[in-house]
Amino acid sequence: MNSIYQYKLATGEEIIGELLEEDEDFLYYKNVLTINRMIIDNSIVHTMNSWITGQFSDNDDTTIIAINPSHITSSNIPTENILNQYRKSISYYVQDSDLQDNQLNLLLCPP
């Protein structure tokens, strides 16, 4: 079963993320990104950005985001193209977070 879902929120934002669990009040996600649509040279291009600042700063993979389902106006199973871009974006954010952590450690604790 695919645990990655795409939602349109009441705010107009479009997000994608990995569903971990749900209860009667919230949906619990990790790795939530916004999907932004742009038209460049008559082609549709999607960019993905971190929805919550700092969610990729922990290497222990424990940042969980609770989403109130009453704020969701529509849902979708992402296309293969969107899924591939999502996976690449997540890899980038995780790698970038590791680089930032290493740089910060060097600044705080020089060799």
Where are the predicted features?
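Conserved RNA-binding domains used in RNP assembly and mRNA/RNA metabolism
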Residues: 2-111
